[in-house]
Amino acid sequence: IKYRLFNKIDQQPIFSVLICGHSGIGKTEVARLMHNKLSPNEPIIKINFGNYSSNDALNSLIGSPRGFIGSKKGELPDKLMRSKSKVILIDEFEKAGKAVYNFFLQLLEEGRFTDSQGREYDLNKYIIIFTSNMPKEKVGDYLSPELLSRFSYKCALGLLSEREKNEYVQYKTQKYLKKIKSKYPAIGENLETSNIVNIDVSLYHNMRDINNEIMRQIADVLYDKVEMEENE
């Protein structure tokens, strides 16, 4: 809703969000939830900047100039052409090099960019979500005031509460069960959240570990169910 309102009242062409916080606390999950609302039938456009700290990082992102030895196609143009999603997820943004920062400084201002082959990409009406593992108080050490001012919205996620962890267990378990019942109705019959997953969330500190435990418990239940049916 904020995204749609923002597009109507602000002149900035791109709605951009910077989400900071420790690893595994749900930054990517927030991006996927937003993507599922706007482009549920398309794969999310995701670029991990863990590999974008080298001197030629910008070439890897938008492509190498014509005639450049060892030319690269460019990950961003390639994924924009492959997916109609309106959500772009930039993961581990703090690891990008200066050239990449400058590229996004211009992109967030103008709403479009030109790749190395001269093709123009208009990203008006897109959402770009930048995630970073840096704590809120360190943001200014990595990003310039000019770049920070370009973001439409900035937030920092803290550690999960017990209530939030339990809500996440319910949400992910229901999501997995829905897929199971859709693809394997015979196996999924009579499976409910209450009788398939039992997690002491106090033992886990982030969503990633909780999700892994959910999948492990579901796999155990499904394996036992399949084995029991085969023995009947």
Which role fits each region the language model picked out?
Residues I9-I47:
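Walker A/P-loop
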Residues G21, D91-E92:
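The Walker A (P-loop) glycine that initiates the GxxxxGKT/S ATP-binding motif of P-loop NTPases
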Residues R32, R66-K72, E92-N166, K175-K178:
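Canonical AAA+ ATPase core
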Residues I47, I88-L89, I128:
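Hydrophobic positions in the central parallel beta-sheet of the AAA+
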Residues K37-G67:
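AAA+/P-loop NTPase substrate/partner-engagement loops
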Residues I1-F15, I218-A219, Y223:
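Pre-Walker A (pre-P-loop) alpha-helix and adjacent loop at the N terminus of AAA/AAA+ ATPase modules
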Residues Q11-I14, P40, N55, M81-K84, ...:
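Short loop/turn elements that form and flank the Walker-type P-loop nucleotide-binding site
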Residues N41-E42, K136-Y204, R208, Y223-M228:
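Conserved C-terminal "switch" segment of AAA+ ATPases
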